[in-house]
């Protein structure tokens, strides 16, 4: 008999609810029979008045909603964040206002490229999205398991995803397209090296890091801003999968990561992460050798050390995956007082695109769904109506300002002010210091055996590409380090013979 909680979910339900509920139609009417349609005689035709069938089938025809265009396959869980260290000198956000304070949260982990039925153990970045239900609104930190990303300008995102997804004619994944994109956008090299290193296939979701990746801005009660980055380190340690083992799991247990997370929580082996921040003053940002808002780069820990903030604990599985995970909507635009945006071009682009895709996928009132609503800070807006609206602010005035005590503003949540200069233009950033940090990753972070595996992993996927793509990628990695390019060229040549 299976021993994992995930294998025994139905048995657990039976034991939890010994008395079955009377089955009903969607309008709550009890049903006499759910095993036969209504017909005129034993062999006669169905009747249009069979509302039990019509009710069931009409809803079944509409069960699916649009799949996420990226991050379609994922797992979710509930938990809490607890402050363990005081950072109020940096941030006035309510959830950080005292040590020991706990804030409920929802997390969603995911792969990026695959569809909702794809395997969990592929070489792919992992989504690491958090929704903090704070007393001053929901804060969504929508990150990944790497501190960097492939591109630094949001205009490239649709084309990157097109190259990552299926070929429009063959409907197959096309490594030529993906490596061609990376070859033509060399700012991606840093993240490509992360992806093809040992870190590229985490061992499930419990043993991977999490990062906000972008540069954000924190503001304290005095109104003083500082730039920051968010980091999450698993208390249970970091582990990755060997590519051979990952390939076997992809066929034998494609839901490996989802299963592992569910069973750990159900067995009360609660996953935990420590949260850290890095901070950079405005003066330091002006003097730094790189663009501090470039998401293809990291802030060196030696110059900007990690500052511990608190811990995140996942202690409750979802009751219904569709309601609590599939309908969950994480959005970088959802910030709270004390957390603000930086000029990071990718972050600025995501502020729009995530909201827009939620409107498409879930409708204009997605924020009213229980999993998305700011239940600890009731929303008071002038937004009204729209499809599936069930919370339309009652009889309050639907305009602002008004003379009828409808709403008021708060002076203490004013955004910080900042200066900006420069000509309005489209600034190409494709050649902005693309190789220095990848070179440090090769020379100082990776050990010799890790470099060998990085080269081998790249050669394995590049081996199926056109020769011109192979040569182009070898050229790019040679710019990182001659040894890197030579080793990759050697392995690709061996595959040809």
UniProtKB/Swiss-Prot annotation:
Gene3D superfamilies according to UniProt: Catalase core domain
Binding positions for heme per the UniProt entry: 354
Disulfide feature: none
Disruption phenotype: No defects in lifespan or egg laying capacity. Abolishes ctl-1 enzymatic activity and reduces the global levels of catalase activity to 75% of the total catalase activity observed in wild-type animals.
GO annotation terms (biological process): hydrogen peroxide catabolic process; response to hydrogen peroxide
Pfam families (alphabetical): Catalase, Catalase-rel
GO cellular component terms attached to this protein's record: cytoplasm; mitochondrion; peroxisome
Enzyme class: oxidoreductase
This enzyme's EC code(s): 1.11.1.6
Taxonomy, superkingdom: Eukaryota
Cofactor: heme
Keyword line: Heme, Hydrogen peroxide, Iron, Metal-binding, Oxidoreductase, Peroxidase
Active site: 71, 144
Reaction catalysis annotation: 2 H2O2 = O2 + 2 H2O
Gene Ontology MF: a single term: metal ion binding
Entry annotated with the keyword 4Fe-4S: no
Induction: Up-regulated in response to Cu(2+). Up-regulated in response to phoxim (an organophosphorus insecticide) and carbaryl (a carbamate insecticide).
Family membership noted in the UniProt record: Belongs to the catalase family.
Function description: Catalase involved in the oxidative stress response serving to protect cells from toxicity. For instance plays a role in defending against oxidative damage induced by excessive copper stress. Not required for maintaining normal lifespan.
Name listed for the protein in its UniProt record: Catalase-2
Native source species: Caenorhabditis elegans
Gene name of the encoded protein: ctl-1
